[in-house]
Amino acid sequence: MKNILIAGVAKSGKSLFCKKLAKKTNYNHIPIDYFTASMKRNFPNWGIKSSVIINDTSKKLSTLLNTVTNLIDDTDEKFIIDSAHIMPSDIIDNINRDNWNIYFFGYPNISAKDKLCEIRKYIKDGWPTKKDDNELITILEKLINISKEMNTQCKKYNIKFIDTSFDLNKKIDELIKKIL
């Protein structure tokens, strides 16, 4: 089994996938977003941003991930790394695909209003609960557009894109079965 990089937009099922897969396997889970937030707070001069919207941080984190994945490649342990701050075009040359499977999660085919309803129904903590509906709709519209761009880039770089616009749990369970 290869190591796994899970990337994609916020609230696309990345963490849920990682938790489910780690529970069924011996993969160690590394959520990069905690490190991103720490770098933002502790080293502001690095220019790392941990906003929900992917920005120039993707290039910087891809360089960091290159070093991390190279170190992991020298171990016998298996890892799942997940991040909401990476674009396919930035990671493609920074990871050894012989040792890593890469999956991007997004929701390019759902309306912001429908995604908002899903979030309000299922998400009971975290940053979405601190946003009012109008704020969240604005963010979701941007994330839907980023999902579309990720999907396009994934096709270009032959990276698997998991569309979680609908049937999120089913899509996650299908991917886990495929990996196992």
Where are these regions (language model features)?
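Conserved substrate/cofactor phosphate-moiety recognition/catalytic segment
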Residues: 19, 23-63
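The conserved Walker
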Residues: 10
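Glycine-rich phosphate-binding loop used to anchor ATP phosphates in small-molecule kinases
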Residues: 56-109
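A glycine- and Lys/Arg-enriched "phosphate-lid" helix/loop adjacent to the NTP-binding pocket
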Residues: 101-146
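Hydrophobic anchor at the beta1->P-loop junction of P-loop NTPases
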Residues: 6
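Conserved Walker
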Residues: 16
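NTP-dependent small-molecule kinase module
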Residues: 148-180
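Conserved glycine(s) of the Walker
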Residues: 13
